[in-house]
A protein has these predicted regions:
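Surface-exposed short loop/turn segments
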Residues: 104-159
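Stable alpha-helical elements in mature extracytoplasmic
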Residues: 40, 72, 76, 80, ...
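Post-signal peptide N-terminal segment of mature Sec-exported envelope proteins
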Residues: 28-46
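N-terminal segment of the mature soluble domain
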Residues: 55-105
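Short secondary-structure boundary motifs at beta->alpha junctions and helix caps
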Residues: 161-197
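C-terminal motif of bacterial Sec signal peptides marking the signal peptidase cleavage site
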Residues: 15-18
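Bacterial N-terminal signal peptides that target proteins for export
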Residues: 1-8
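Bacterial lipoprotein signal-peptidase II cleavage site
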Residues: 20-26
Length: 206
């Protein structure tokens, strides 16, 4: 169920980035890792439409929601949209019309989260999936350690609320670390890593 693609064997640097501003893309890791996971019980062919939140949530130490929305973030969002379209899904403007919703998050400070079984996750982080007070739920086991400069993508099944506290189900996620830089070459590397996340998720198709 889990897949980990190590793109570089060099150790990742941990850098400090302010969560009050857009990420400083000149100060992030130069080596990257691509990790994906999914709910083995989900039939991804049953989904038809998707919606992507157009800003990237910045997860840091702030108690207020902050979002990354500039040219670089839009290129990252667009890359996920293209991959989902290539997988056969149709984009829709309104989240209420979508079978699945993708939200992207950027880790602005090193964050550690560990779990060994299914359960709610991130349901109290400010601004995270702020949709009608619903929480979010992973039906599969996982253990993560998130580094500064990571991007997390999560697909939510909007039609499958779980019986636990009205949580909606995360059916797929990707974790890509050390991608970003201010020049075109590093953005190309970022696009390659996003492509790799979908390449190692062959089940994610219409």
């Amino acid at each position: 169920m889990k897949k980990l693609q190590i793109i570089s064997l060099t150790a990742l640097m941990v850098l400090s980035v302010s969560c009050q501003k857009d990420p400083d893309t000149n100060r992030l890791d130069n080596d990257y890792i691509v990790y994906t996971n999914y709910d083995i019980g989900t039939d991804f062919k049953s989904f038809g439409t998707f919606h992507v939140i157009d800003s990237i949530l910045i997860i840091g130490n702030s108690d207020k929601a902050a979002y990354w929305n500039n040219d670089n973030s839009r290129k990252i969002v667009d890359a996920y949209v293209i991959e989902l379209e290539n997988a056969g899904y149709t984009p829709v403007e309104e989240s209420e019309e979508a079978d699945i919703i993708l939200q992207l998050s950027y880790i602005s400070n090193t964050y550690y989260f560990t779990s060994f079984g299914p359960g709610p996750w991130w349901n109290s982080y400010p601004g995270y999936w702020n949709w009608g007070g619903w929480g979010w739920y992973y039906p599969y086991s996982f253990t993560y350690s998130y580094s500064t400069g990571s991007i997390i993508g999560e697909l939510i099944d909007t039609n499958a609320p779980t019986p636990q506290n009205d949580k909606l189900t995360v059916v797929w996620n990707s974790y890509i670390c050390g991608l970003l830089d201010g020049n075109n070459l590093s953005l190309s590397r970022t696009m390659a890593a996003i492509n790799q996340a979908f390449k190692q998720s062959p089940y994610l198709t219409k």
